[in-house]
């Protein structure tokens, strides 16, 4: 576990000069909300539907003996991480929605291990579903989900958090990895 020594209840403070200079959008836009559309949950649901449709129309089975137990373990672990992350966000009284403005910088719970525990759990859920169902299509869809989540959500969320929390967020980024 990474020891993150940052004010656990950091309130928005402003922007760093470096972030303001690098950003391609006005800082006020970043400060209000990271994005207009809640991409990550939509991407997850779309990937599940695509995996089921592809598995039905073009079956490509996973047949190794431990696939189902491994898939179940990934799903349970992913759900537990999701619940833990959402509980940490709720405890800090900030939003769980990726398109809403964050009122607090959450650095405890699963956020002390990774800056994006919910998105990691989404990937785990997709991989677990593929293994549990014996459907190979979920594996490339999990990778696609992670890449699209990065480009459509994470980059903007990072700008939003930096615009709102400045040096505290930069210190958090130095202490905790984006993924794992």
Spans of features found by a protein language model:
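Extended, alpha-helix-rich binding/interface surfaces that flank or overlap catalytic cores
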Residues: 116
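Membrane-anchoring alpha-helices and their flanking helix-loop junctions
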Residues: 2-108, 120-180
């Amino acid at each position: 576990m990474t020891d993150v020594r940052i004010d656990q209840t950091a309130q928005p403070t402003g922007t760093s000069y470096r972030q303001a200079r690098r950003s391609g959008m006005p800082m006020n836009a970043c400060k209000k909300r990271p994005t207009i559309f809640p991409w990550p949950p939509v991407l997850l649901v779309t990937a599940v539907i695509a995996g089921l449709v592809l598995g039905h129309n073009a079956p490509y089975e996973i047949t190794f003996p431990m696939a189902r137990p491994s898939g179940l373990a990934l799903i349970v672990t992913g759900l537990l991480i999701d619940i833990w992350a959402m509980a940490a966000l709720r405890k800090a009284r900030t939003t769980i929605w990726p398109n809403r403005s964050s009122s607090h910088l959450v650095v405890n719970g699963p956020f002390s291990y990774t800056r994006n525990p919910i998105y990691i759990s989404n990937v785990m859920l997709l991989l677990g579903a593929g293994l549990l169902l014996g459907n190979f299509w979920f594996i490339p869809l999990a990778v696609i989900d992670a890449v699209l989540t990065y480009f459509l959500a994470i980059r903007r969320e990072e700008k939003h958090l930096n615009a709102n929390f400045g040096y505290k967020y930069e210190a958090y980024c130095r202490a905790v990895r984006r993924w794992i």
